[in-house]
Structure formats: structure tokens, C-alpha cells
Swiss-Prot record:
<dbReference type="InterPro" id="IPR029021">
    <property type="entry name" value="Prot-tyrosine_phosphatase-like"/>
</dbReference>
<dbReference type="InterPro" id="IPR004861">
    <property type="entry name" value="Siw14-like"/>
</dbReference>
<dbReference type="GO" id="GO:0042802">
    <property type="term" value="F:identical protein binding"/>
</dbReference>
<feature type="domain" description="Tyrosine-protein phosphatase">
    <location>
        <begin position="66"/>
        <end position="251"/>
    </location>
</feature>
<dbReference type="InterPro" id="IPR016130">
    <property type="entry name" value="Tyr_Pase_AS"/>
</dbReference>
<feature type="binding site">
    <location>
        <position position="172"/>
    </location>
    <ligand>
        <name>1D-myo-inositol hexakisphosphate</name>
    </ligand>
</feature>
<dbReference type="InterPro" id="IPR020422">
    <property type="entry name" value="TYR_PHOSPHATASE_DUAL_dom"/>
</dbReference>
<keyword id="KW-0378">Hydrolase</keyword>
<feature type="binding site">
    <location>
        <position position="168"/>
    </location>
    <ligand>
        <name>1D-myo-inositol hexakisphosphate</name>
    </ligand>
</feature>
<dbReference type="InterPro" id="IPR020428">
    <property type="entry name" value="PFA-DSPs"/>
</dbReference>
<feature type="active site" description="Phosphocysteine intermediate">
    <location>
        <position position="192"/>
    </location>
</feature>
<dbReference type="InterPro" id="IPR000387">
    <property type="entry name" value="Tyr_Pase_dom"/>
</dbReference>
<comment type="similarity">
    <text>Belongs to the protein-tyrosine phosphatase family. Atypical dual-specificity phosphatase Siw14-like subfamily.</text>
</comment>
<feature type="site" description="Transition state stabilizer">
    <location>
        <position position="198"/>
    </location>
</feature>
<dbReference type="GO" id="GO:0052848">
    <property type="term" value="F:inositol-3,5-bisdiphosphate-2,3,4,6-tetrakisphosphate 5-diphosphatase activity"/>
</dbReference>
<dbReference type="GO" id="GO:0052845">
    <property type="term" value="F:inositol-5-diphosphate-1,2,3,4,6-pentakisphosphate diphosphatase activity"/>
</dbReference>
<dbReference type="GO" id="GO:0004725">
    <property type="term" value="F:protein tyrosine phosphatase activity"/>
</dbReference>
Amino acid sequence: MKLIEKTMSMNQFRTMEEEKQDGGELFHTIEVAKVDRNNVSQPPPAATAALLEVPGDELNLIPPLNFSMVDNGIFRSGFPDSANFSFIKTLGLRSIISLCPEPYPENNMQFLKSNGISLFQFGIEGSKSKCLPGLENEVWLHIWSSKHQKEDFYTNGNSKTSEPFVDILDQKIREALKVLLDEKNHPLLIHCKRGKHRTGCLVGCMRKLQKWCITSILDEYKRFAAAKARVSDQRFLESFDVSGLKHTPMSFSCSNR
């Protein structure tokens, strides 16, 4: 074998390898180009500027507080405001489920109207004290654990109170679930004030229909509620009866779990 090296024009080098095979000669040719690093052309300034140009709307995609995807076509968050509108538009929503009892802000209503988004509002009080004044968490839990005892009343000081909040919560969650599980309403966003407790209860009840184990349901609830996790909410999720909703159609991704 012998190597033959020749100098080529245009600063190129050609190396030829000569091999003898079966009495014949086989040549392999390799061309190597020498690059002058001092003479590399640069893109024009206009082209560089075009590469860096980003539409203003894309720089303002701010998700609402505690935003997350729940399932295909289902999202959750805290109460969205005008800073979140550009982001929400990217979701292509058909519906919003609001779990807040307060009148929906006019600015938000205008946004929904201009984007063809339907609003389903199921007002659930966010503070236990507003529904059960003066009752501590332990007493509220006792109310919840006895919710099927129709004649049961509970004393707080010298006053008596029944269990209105438990029944209202159960009723509102069931109404909201019917909207949530109807795929005609998807894509859909669920929200309360901060996307923790009321939203967590609704999502947790949906998980029961998806046959999640209660440990996983509570883990998801606590992941969003964090240090604000309420024992009362967790008891509600443990006790929520889905038997009357088992025939509700669910065709989205996790329905067969």
C-alpha cells in the first residue's frame, strides 16, 4: 500500500489511497476543504433581528395561580384575572366551572363572551366560618360524619345549628360533576379563589369516579393545598358517595382506571 498526496488549488488537499486487491488497483479519494476562519460570512443584521423577534402576546402567557392539567381537556386553577387572559386563550376553552359564590367580574365576563366560553357557576362558600359560624374544625367533622342522621343537631354555645353546609356542598359538587363529565363542555377550566380547596374537592370526587384509590386522591388534594390542607375536605372526599353517578358517561383518558 502506498499513499500519494497531491496539493490541490483552492486550498484543498486530496489524499488517495491505493490498494491492491485481486491483482487490480482500487483507489479511495478523500477531499478535505480548508476553511479560512477569518473569511466566514455573517448574516445581515436584519436577518439576526428577525430571528430574535417574538410576538408580544407570547411574552405575556401567564397561567393563573395553581394552574395544572387534570385530564385531557380538563384544567384547574385559581381565579383567573386579566393578566392570564392571553394564556387562557391558548387553551381553546369551551367552558369554565367557577366554584365561587360571588358575582363574576365584568372584565372576566367580557373575556368569556368575546371568546365563546360558557360559564357554569356553582357557588360554594370558601370559608367554613361563613357557613358554620363559631364551629371549630372538629365539630364540623362531627357534622359531616353524621350527615345522614336527619334529626341530628349540634350545639355551639347556647345556639343550635344543623348541617346546611354539608348538604349544600354535596349538592353543588354533584351538579358541577355533571357539567365536568360532559365532554361537550371540554376543554374546560375549573377554578375557585386559589385553586386549592373547593377545586380540590371537585377534582377529588371526579377521581373517585375514575376509580382512583383514596390515598392517591388525598395525595393530589394535599399537593395543591400544601400547608393549607383541610382535614374536613379530606373527610368529605373519603365519604363522598359516587354510586348515583356511576352511569355518567366518561370518555376522556383516565375513565377506565
